[in-house]
Design a protein with these regions (language model features):
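Ligand-binding loop in jelly-roll beta-barrel domains
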Residues: 70-91
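Short, conserved beta-strand element in jelly-roll/cupin
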Residues: 30-46
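Conserved short histidine dyad/triad with adjacent acidic residue
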Residues: 14-30, 49, 69
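Short beta-strand His + acidic residue motifs that chelate non-heme Fe in jelly-roll/DSBH
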Residues: 26-28, 46-47, 72-79
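Short acidic-glycine-tyrosine-enriched beta hairpin
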Residues: 51-69
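Catalytic phosphate/metal-binding cores of nucleic-acid and nucleotide-processing enzymes, i.e., regions
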Residues: 2, 12
Length: 91
C-alpha cells in the first residue's frame, strides 16, 4: 500500500505527499474535495476507476493537474521505480 504523509491540514486545505514503491497502490477511494496533484518525478500511474476502466497516465515532474471532487479510483505505481506526488485538496 502506498504511504501518505499529511504535511498540512487546516480548515481550507490538506496537503499530502503520496509515496509508492513499485506496484503499490492507494486502494479504491472517493475524493471528498477538488484537488491538484504535483508529480515529484516523471513516470506513469495506472488509474482504475469504480467500473474497472483502466487508464495509464503519463506524468511530468512539476506539471500539475486538477480534478473535481467525487473522483472514485485506485492509483497504482506503473513504473519500475518508486514514485511520489503531492496532492493538494481544497476543502
Amino acid at each position: 500500500m502506498a504511504t501518505s504523509d499529511i504535511q498540512i491540514d487546516n480548515k481550507r486545505t490538506r496537503v499530502t505527499r503520496w509515496s509508492f514503491e513499485v506496484g503499490e497502490d492507494t486502494g479504491q477511494h472517493i475524493h471528498e474535495y477538488d484537488y491538484v496533484v504535483v508529480p515529484m518525478e516523471d513516470g506513469q500511474l495506472k488509474i482504475v476507476d469504480q467500473d474497472g476502466t483502466v487508464l495509464i497516465s503519463d506524468l511530468i515532474k512539476g506539471k500539475s493537474y486538477y480534478r473535481n471532487k467525487g473522483v472514485n479510483h485506485n492509483v497504482i505505481n506503473h513504473n519500475d521505480f518508486p514514485f511520489s506526488f503531492v496532492e493538494i485538496e481544497f476543502k
